[in-house]
């Protein structure tokens, strides 16, 4: 979550809202096929047992297996820390500390390859990564804004925060079986018909993000006082 999950054999999450809109746009009924995990969904689509895979990251070695839509979900990767830690405006400031990543994710591998000299520690899930941050085992965790925001909102509110971002994006596509290029083209048109407000509504329904920035309240108060002093000085000089 928040992208998608199965609860009582029901598909929920941001992607389910996308699928409902696509169903409405195309005026067709889409039948949900429950699977035990994403890998099973991937295999069923490759074997043409399912028509649509709702979410997949593009990789060149998958081109001969699936047709990809254009990316329809695009989130920055962010840095989560304990609430007492300062704003992080440059990831290079984390070179000498431990950073948690989710084990086995293609996006985690991408980050490790780009930042080769960093001290990454892998955990089975994002929840485990953030628990490690909370317990001081690592300084920070990195993942997409959506999943970190959802996890903090539901399990670490008041303990962890989003303290910065890195120059990587999570781009997700839908996919169809390699033999069904026409369907991928139809999905692209349906996705293009979803406007920005609808996309924001889908996201905000599941995730609330409080993004830490480097202008904290104390600094804003100091700036306000300084501006007031300057105004008073000019008023005295030019009265």
Language model: regions and residue ranges:
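Extracytoplasmic small-molecule ligand-binding "clamshell" domains
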Residues: 1-64, 119-126, 130-131, 187
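Extended ligand-binding regions for polar small-molecule ligands
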Residues: 13-25, 83-108, 112-113, 145-149, ...
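N-terminal/domain-start segments enriched in small and hydrophobic, helix-friendly residues
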Residues: 30-32, 56, 68-82, 88-101
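A ligand-binding cleft/hinge motif common to bilobed small-molecule-binding domains
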Residues: 39, 43, 54-65, 110-113, ...
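Conserved functional loop/turn residues at catalytic and ligand-binding sites
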Residues: 49, 98, 137
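Short beta-strand->loop
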Residues: 66-74, 78, 121, 157-168, ...
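Carboxylate-rich, polar loop motifs that coordinate divalent cations or form catalytic acidic clusters
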Residues: 86, 125-129, 141-150, 178, ...
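Alpha-helical transmembrane signal-anchor helices
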Residues: 212-239
């Amino acid at each position: 979550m928040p992208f998608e999950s199965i609860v009582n054999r029901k598909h929920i999450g941001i992607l389910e809202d996308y699928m409902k809109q696509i169903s409405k746009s195309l005026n067709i009924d889409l039948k949900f096929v429950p699977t035990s995990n994403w890998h099973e969904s991937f295999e069923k689509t490759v074997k043409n047992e399912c028509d649509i895979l709702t979410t997949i990251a593009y990789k060149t070695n998958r081109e001969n297996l699936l047709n990809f839509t254009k990316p329809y979900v695009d989130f920055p990767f962010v840095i989560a820390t304990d609430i007492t830690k300062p704003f992080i405006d440059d990831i290079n400031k984390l070179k000498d500390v431990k950073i948690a990543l989710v084990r086995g994710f293609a996006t985690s591998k991408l980050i490790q390859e780009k930042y080769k000299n960093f001290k990454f520690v892998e955990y089975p899930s994002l929840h485990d990564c953030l628990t490690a941050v909370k317990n001081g085992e690592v300084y920070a965790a990195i993942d997409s804004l959506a999943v970190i925001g959802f996890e903090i909102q539901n399990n670490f509110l008041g303990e962890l925060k989003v303290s910065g971002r890195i120059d990587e994006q999570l781009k997700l596509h839908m996919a169809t079986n390699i033999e069904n290029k026409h369907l991928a083209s139809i999905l692209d048109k349906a996705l293009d018909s979803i406007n920005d407000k609808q996309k924001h509504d889908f996201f905000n329904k599941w995730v609330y993000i409080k993004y830490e920035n480097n202008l904290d309240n104390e600094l804003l108060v100091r700036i306000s006082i300084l501006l007031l002093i300057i105004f008073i000085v000019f008023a005295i000089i030019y009265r």
